[in-house]
A protein has these predicted regions:
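A short helix->loop->beta-strand "cap" motif at the edges of active sites that frequently abuts
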Residues: 248-252
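Oxyanion-hole/transition-state-stabilizing segment in secreted/luminal serine hydrolases
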Residues: 181, 200-235, 259-264
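N-terminal secretory targeting modules
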Residues: 1-157, 265, 271, 275, ...
Length: 345
């Protein structure tokens, strides 16, 4: 049985409103105005349209689910996949990852087993790829399966960041540090991580002003170190972003740019044409220190540093960890910050 995107039993979770009027849906995170704002910045534009942190939800007892995708495109040369979570009677989640979709483009059907039996109605959540883009043309379940709509979730955590927040470079949507802590803290989240983005307050204003947020985390600054011209503006732009966050959030956390191997002259010498040398490492260190000094003037902002090991082997491409590294990031943040009881459901 194939359900079209217009079927009300399918619930789409995305920061932007979902247009169900056509035979396909794209789960968008950012409004068009942000694309216009960042025009000319090649890195961010390639990542703005990903459906990182977006999902399809339904209640079913089908033993399998097929996600029908079209116009699947890959923007980075790393493995990408979708993933399925099935809620268990005790409230935990059984997880299933797809194979690597990087080997496919265009029209792709992804079959995911649920392990469910007839009459065993459970909440199922299908998570979209972290970096690749696609439209959803439908979801299929077994012909005799029962299907109901899953209650919508109101997000209570806004995660603002760059490629580390987006999840570069892990294959599974479940492996990003945001997803790990979303489940641990029981805080439905909007993941607004954008690989390559600078500290751009106006790119996130719309999200911060969308509602009152119990928690906002910000993990930006590394990309300001790529050029000398963007180092000096980092602290001032951070202050503008923090002012916006404090006006719209109960708790604000800033994760400073983590250590990079190039700061010690280690790791690869370049990343997609960008030099990873000591000069670049020195600029990132300067940005980190400038942020530390400026953010110290905000007593209510929790500033967290050094969330990743100083070991170049954790960063295969010189900048990003794999799933194990994201687990370490999540563990470190959880050990040093706890959302208030009012935030956690």
């Amino acid at each position: 049985m194939r359900l079209s995107p217009s079927d009300p039993r399918l619930c789409f979770n995305a920061p932007q409103a979902v247009d169900r009027s056509r035979g396909e849906v794209r789960l968008e995170r950012f409004p068009p105005a942000v694309t216009k704002l960042l025009m000319g910045q090649i890195g961010p534009l390639a990542n703005l349209r990903s459906s990182c942190g977006c999902s399809i939800r339904l209640l079913t007892d089908s033993p399998w689910i097929i996600l029908h995708l079209d116009r699947l495109r890959h923007h980075q040369p790393i493995p990408q996949g979708v993933a399925l979570e099935i809620k268990q009677p005790d409230g935990t989640w059984l997880t299933v990852d797809s194979s690597d979709l990087r080997e496919h483009e265009g029209v792709v059907d992804v079959r995911l087993p649920t392990g469910l039996c007839a009459g065993e109605l459970s909440e199922c959540v299908v998570w979209m790829p972290l970096l690749s883009t696609a439209v959803i043309t439908g979801v299929s379940v077994a012909d005799d399966a029962h299907i109901e709509s899953s209650p919508e979730e109101t997000p209570s955590w806004l995660a603002i960041g760059d490629s580390l927040t987006q999840g570069f470079s892990t294959q599974s949507p479940l492996s990003s540090w945001v997803h790990r802590l979303m489940r641990q803290w029981k805080l439905p989240a909007w993941n607004l991580g954008v690989g390559g983005i600078l500290i751009e307050p106006e790119a996130f204003r719309w999200a911060l002003e969308a509602q009152r947020w119990p928690l906002v985390t910000i993990a930006l600054g590394s990309n300001n170190g790529w050029r000398e011209s963007t180092v000096d503006c980092a602290a001032d732009n951070a202050a503008l972003l923090v002012d916006l966050a404090l006006a719209n959030a109960d708790q604000v956390v800033w994760c400073l740019p983590p250590w990079k191997p190039m700061e010690d002259g280690k790791g690869p010498t370049e990343f997609m044409g960008i030099p990873l040398d000591r000069d670049t490492g020195s600029r990132i260190a300067r940005v980190r220190e400038a942020l530390r000094v400026r953010l110290a003037t905000y007593p209510s902002v929790v500033v967290i540093d050094d969330l990743m090991p100083h070991d170049h082997r954790w960063y295969p491409d010189g900048l990003h960890p794999f799933a194990w590294g994201f687990a370490r990031f999540a563990e470190g943040l959880a050990a040093r910050f706890h959302p208030t009881a009012a935030s956690v459901r």
